[in-house]
Swiss-Prot record:
Listed transmembrane segments: 59-75
Protein name: Mitochondrial import inner membrane translocase subunit tim54
InterPro entries in alphabetical order: Lipid_Phosphate_FormReg (IPR050187), Mt_import_IM_translocase_Tim54 (IPR021056)
Quaternary structure note: Component of the TIM22 complex, whose core is composed of tim22 and tim54, associated with the 70 kDa heterohexamer composed of tim9 and tim10 (or tim8 and tim13).
Organelle transit peptide: 1-52
Record flagged with keyword Protein transport: yes
Ranges of Basic and acidic residues composition bias in the record: 254-269
Family the entry assigns: Belongs to the TIM54 family.
Keywords carried by this UniProt record: Membrane, Mitochondrion, Mitochondrion inner membrane, Protein transport, Transit peptide, Translocation, Transmembrane, Transmembrane helix, Transport
Topological domains annotated Mitochondrial intermembrane: 76-468
Record carries keyword Mitochondrion: yes
Length: 468
């Protein structure tokens, strides 16, 4: 008989023996990559190493605005140089024309440049404006010119009037010839020319007037010189000085001696010559007579733009003009080219039936560059006798232009003809004349490399006779 199956054991299984082994440690991290050396200049500016992504929003705005302003300035300056070069090429053929007088006994054509300090500023501003826009075209034409510069209001008026009075005195032969008087520099030059038989230029000369303020003085000087008297009017007798009390003089005589001695020791500073007073006024034009020898056509003239505005609140206007100097260069170049080519026309006039009889005729001379008066400082329009400049004998800038019909019809204005306009429009300025320093340097470097690589000069062996 088989043995019975033993019953299953009900006792719990024995627990496994505890292990004393520990798990292995994790592998060490890889060594960090070596950082790129940082530019110290960028680090001081707060710029780390440039990442491989677009800059932030603020940086994008900054670079966009900076690039736009830089591009606008570069484009405007390049086009300004292009416009000036175009008008230079339009008149440069005049410099190549041969002189008709082979003996040199005829004076060349000479222009007169009138410029003065703009209201509220100095003369240097007008000189810089002339050098930047007017001089390049004049220099390319090969013409000669002279300057009339005014530092004070009325200086140009006085020079223009005195020159015309000198011409009238020569017609009437009423200029006093004092044998004991020393001749001036201009008179010595004129005497030398007469002795050598040098003739004056008989063609069209020309006057270039820069700025509305100078144009007003120029017109005032024309009327004073052609219509005014040849002798200065008598000045009113000055009032006798009132004597000071004797007691006050005795009490301060001992105290003022040291001050008087100091004043005598100091060298007196040279003073400017006084400005000549005008010989007539605008109300005298109608009652004055015009000399019968006055030419039917006066010397042609042209006013040149000189936009000049001051003040912090006018910054937007100044910024617009700063980015649009190319149009200013084109307008001034056109006017100066007309002067060089000696093409002129009559000044126009309009009739206004609604205006009073005295102002029914509007002359073009009075409207030239009238918009520039809006840019003048407010203090120019304040005519205060207490603060007025004692050296200025007449206020011309703030007064309206008064024209006499006899002179208005004789005046001529320089202007280009349609034929000249068509000829100038076909002028193409090469890029090499207007490009900047960076682009020009790159172009020269490329040309130099191309010549070195492909345009090698062939060396020709010398013969013995060439060496000897």
């Amino acid at each position: 008989m088989a043995d019975p199956v033993p019953p299953a054991s009900t006792a719990p299984p024995a627990a496994p023996a505890a292990t004393t082994a520990t798990p292995p440690p994790p592998p060490p991290p890889p060594p960090p990559k070596a950082l790129r050396p940082q530019n110290q200049a960028l680090r001081m500016l707060g710029l780390p190493n440039l990442p491989n992504k677009l800059p932030s929003r603020n940086w994008m705005i900054f670079w966009t605005v900076s690039a736009s302003i830089t591009a606008a300035i570069i484009y405007d300056r390049r086009e300004k140089r292009r416009n000036i070069a175009k008008w230079r090429h339009a008149v440069e053929h005049l410099a190549a024309e041969p002189i008709t007088d082979k003996l040199g006994l005829e004076q060349p054509r000479k222009l007169t440049i009138y410029l003065s300090a703009p209201p509220g500023d100095g003369l240097r501003v007008a000189q810089d404006h002339y050098t930047e826009y007017v001089k390049p075209v004049l220099a390319a034409s090969g013409l000669d010119w002279e300057f009339v510069q005014g530092r004070r209001e009325g200086d140009v008026r006085a020079v223009v009037a005195e020159r015309l009075r000198k011409v009238r005195r020569g017609w009437e032969n009423k200029e006093e010839q004092d044998p004991n008087r020393e001749p001036t520099k201009d008179e010595l030059i004129e005497i030398y020319r007469q002795q050598r038989g040098i003739k004056d230029y008989e063609g069209v000369r020309g006057d270039v007037v820069i700025g509305r303020h100078t144009w007003k003085e120029y017109l005032r000087g024309l009327h004073e010189g052609w219509l005014g008297p040849l002798v200065a009017p008598a000045e009113p007798a000055p009032l006798p000085p009132t004597p000071a009390p004797a007691a006050a003089e005795g009490s301060t005589s001992t105290e003022d001696k040291p001050a008087e001695e100091k004043k005598e020791e100091e060298a007196p500073k040279p003073k400017r010559p006084p400005q000549p007073k005008p010989y007539n006024t605008t109300s005298d034009y109608s009652s004055e007579t015009l000399h019968p020898l006055t030419p039917q056509e006066l010397t042609p003239a042209v006013p040149i733009r000189e936009p000049h505005i001051l003040g912090f609140l006018n910054t937007p206007t100044r910024m617009v003009r700063f980015f649009n100097r190319r149009s200013l260069a084109d307008d001034i170049g056109r006017e100066v080219a007309a002067v060089c080519l000696a093409t002129h026309r009559e000044f126009q006039q309009q009739t206004n039936p609604d205006a009073p009889s005295t102002d029914s005729v509007q002359y073009e001379q009075a409207k030239e560059l009238e918009w520039e008066e809006q840019d003048w400082p407010k203090k120019v329009w304040k005519e205060d006798e207490a603060d007025a400049d004692k050296e200025v004998t007449e206020k011309i800038h703030i007064k309206p232009v008064v024209m006499d019909p006899r002179l208005a019809h004789r005046m001529r204005r320089f202007a280009l003809t349609p034929e000249d306009e068509d000829r100038v429009s076909k002028i193409k300025v090469p890029e090499e004349e207007v490009e900047g320093w960076i682009k020009g340097s790159l172009r020269k470097a490329c040309h130099w490399g191309y010549d070195k690589a492909f345009n090698k000069k062939k060396l020709v062996p010398l013969e013995d006779k060439d060496v000897e």
